[in-house]
Amino acid sequence: MMFRLTSVGSFLLVIVFLNLVVLTNACDLEGMFCMYDFECCLSECCMGICAFGCTKRAQRQKLLRSFGQR
C-alpha cells in the first residue's frame, strides 16, 4: 500500500512540474522579441518587440523618422 501511494504521489508531482514549465514559457515580457501578439504577456507585438500600448501612430512616427521627416 505504501508503494502505491508513493508512486501516485510521484506521478502527480511530475504532472504539476510539467504544468509549471508550460505556464512559465507561455508568454514573453515587455521588451522581448516577438512575431505575433499572442506571444506577449499583457501587451502586443509591435515591430518585433513586446510593447504595451503600441498604436499605428507610433509605427507611423518611426517610419517618418527613418525617412528623415518629422
From Swiss-Prot:
It is found in: Secreted. It comes from the Eukaryota. Belongs to the conotoxin I2 superfamily. Residues 58-70 form a propeptide. The cysteine framework is XI (C-C-CC-CC-C-C). Residues 1-26 form the signal peptide. GO terms for molecular function: toxin activity. Pfam families: Conotoxin_I2 (PF17557). Its main location: secreted. This is Conotoxin Lt11.6. Disulfide bonds join C27-C41, C34-C46, C40-C50, C45-C54. One of its GO terms (cellular component) is extracellular region. It comes from Conus litteratus. The keyword Signal applies. Keywords: Cleavage on pair of basic residues, Disulfide bond, Secreted, Signal, Toxin. The keyword Disulfide bond applies.
